[in-house]
Amino acid sequence: MPISKTLPYNAIEQIKSYLLQLQNTICVSLESIDGKTRFHEDSWQRAAGGGGKTRIMANGNVFEKAGVNFSHVSGEQLPASASAHREELAGRHFSALGVSLVIHPQNPYVPTTHANVRFFVAEKEDSEPVWWFGGGFDLTPYYGFVEDCEHWHQTALNACLPFGETIYPKFKRWCDDYFFIKHRNEARGIGGLFFDDYNEISFDHSFELMRSIGDHFILAYEPIVARRKDIPFGNREKAFQNYRRGRYAEFNLVYDRGTLFGLQSGGRTESILMSLPPIVHWEYNWHPEKGSDEEKLYTDFLPAKDWLKKE
């Protein structure tokens, strides 16, 4: 007998409860790491339906800017970014819940990171609801360390293994493909996990997978921050960090599905654009010095690779 993909009557309540708990857990952990600054919470309502809680930290000891956003929005019609390739969604009203975060550190030796877990459901009278989960986490170093990349991907693998051996390679490859800046012909970072439109086996199975990925994020990021946050740096490293942040801004404004969905669905602009770095620098036709640590980011870390392959 096949396992049903029927949506439980209290699915939204289950997911919302988990997401709020995840937001709080991550914020408490980041406050503990920073040791100086606490998150400011900004609750907001969306006129077309729903709302959220945006938490922002700025000018901390460790984190220059960190945003952890919970949103639960609804509407009568999905925006183009969510329905362009799914004709069955036409004419359905939707609910979308998620936690999305971006962390921009002070120290250039600490990587920037992004994570997101989300749920969509599109419903229509006299029809089965169409639902799916999505999310992932990815790492954007400025100065690469092999042990950090290996730890990041090992933790990503650990999040996926309970659901089968094929999940991590699939989601890892998806992440490498998704976070690629086409107009620059380079990756945004060293990847991690990315998945979308996931509703395999059953609701419970899919929800458990999303929770596992959400719960493993801080386990992946916290040890890297602890190792790198006190490394001395100077103007050169800070300038390179600000230059590379430009790539981050370019990707988010041109390609990111979450940004496009939020703006097209009439979301809250301040919360949607919280992912942008506080300071960014563009320099015309800049190239790193040969043999420098900055060049190694491009040659040794940004090209997609299997970080867990044992030689």
From Swiss-Prot:
Domain of life of the native organism: Bacteria
Cofactor(s) named in the record: a divalent metal cation
Keyword list, A-Z: Cytoplasm, Heme biosynthesis, Metal-binding, Oxidoreductase, Porphyrin biosynthesis
Assembly description: Homodimer.
Protein family membership: Belongs to the aerobic coproporphyrinogen-III oxidase family.
Function according to Swiss-Prot or TrEMBL: Involved in the heme biosynthesis. Catalyzes the aerobic oxidative decarboxylation of propionate groups of rings A and B of coproporphyrinogen-III to yield the vinyl groups in protoporphyrinogen-IX.
Protein name: Oxygen-dependent coproporphyrinogen-III oxidase
Organism this protein belongs to: Legionella pneumophila subsp. pneumophila (strain Philadelphia 1 / ATCC 33152 / DSM 7513)
Source taxonomy: Bacteria, Pseudomonadati, Pseudomonadota, Gammaproteobacteria, Legionellales
Protein encoded by which gene: hemF
